[in-house]
Structure formats: C-alpha cells, structure tokens
From Swiss-Prot:
Record's protein name: Protein translation factor sui1
Protein's organism: Schizosaccharomyces pombe (strain 972 / ATCC 24843) (Fission yeast)
Family per record: Belongs to the SUI1 family.
Transmembrane feature ranges: none
Pfam families (UniProt xref): SUI1
Gene designation per UniProt: sui1
Single annotated GO MF: ribosomal small subunit binding
UniProt-annotated stretches for the region Disordered: 1-22
Entry GO terms, CC: cytosol; eukaryotic 43S preinitiation complex
Cysteine disulfide partners in this protein: none
Physiological role: Additional factor that functions in concert with eIF-2 and the initiator tRNA in directing the ribosome to the proper start site of translation.
An annotated GO BP: regulation of translation
Keywords annotated in UniProt: Protein biosynthesis, Translation regulation
Length: 109
C-alpha cells in the first residue's frame, strides 16, 4: 500500500518571480480648492528611494511656488504645492525622475 503524503502547500497567487512586474503603487497628483481661486496641488505615493525634500526643493525652484511636506498617518508623506501644478509635476516626474506615465494618476476638476 503506497500512500502519497504531500504536505507542501502551494499558493497559486504567490509571486512567480517575474522581475518585470510593476508595483501596484501609483503616484497620485490631486488638486484641492482653498479660499476663492486659491488651490493646492498634492503629490502622494512617491517611491521611498527618492528624497522628498530634494524633490520639493526642485519643484519649488522650477515652478516658482511655495510648498511643504505633510506627514499623514494613512498616506505617508505628501508634498503640497501652492497653485495648480498638476501637469508640471507630471512632466517633472517623468522627465527628471524617469517615472512612467502609466503609474501617475492625475485627479481634479
């Protein structure tokens, strides 16, 4: 009597080892309305490999606007810029940092 005992578990949804798979983390660029015509642009979901302070400094210099980094419990570090800078931020992220457009989502009006 031969009994086959296979105690190994197989997870069909486990990582197959493909290095080509893109992370599911997207970068979200949003605009928020403030008083009257004033707006804020927020950038969240930047990869941790980038120094957010240096990115903020470059964005402020290139766009001639003020900005800050806000720490949120759920979202992590969020970059806030004054004004509607959505398109400019997307171009900066793709050209200067080499991120792909398909991983950047623009929200707003």
């Amino acid at each position: 009597m031969s009994a086959i005992q296979n105690f190994n578990t197989v997870d069909p949804f486990a990582d197959t080892g493909d290095d080509d798979a893109q992370p599911l983390n997207n970068i979200h660029i949003r605009i928020q309305q403030r008083n009257g015509r004033k707006t804020l642009t927020t950038v969240q979901g930047l990869p941790r490999e980038f120094d957010q302070k240096r990115i903020l400094r470059a964005l402020k210099k290139d766009f001639a606007c003020n900005g800050t980094i806000v720490k949120d419990d759920d979202l992590g570090e969020v970059i806030q810029l004054q004004g509607d800078q959505r398109i400019k931020v997307m171009e900066f992220l793709t050209q200067q940092l080499g991120l792909q457009k398909k991983n950047i989502k623009i929200h707003g009006f």
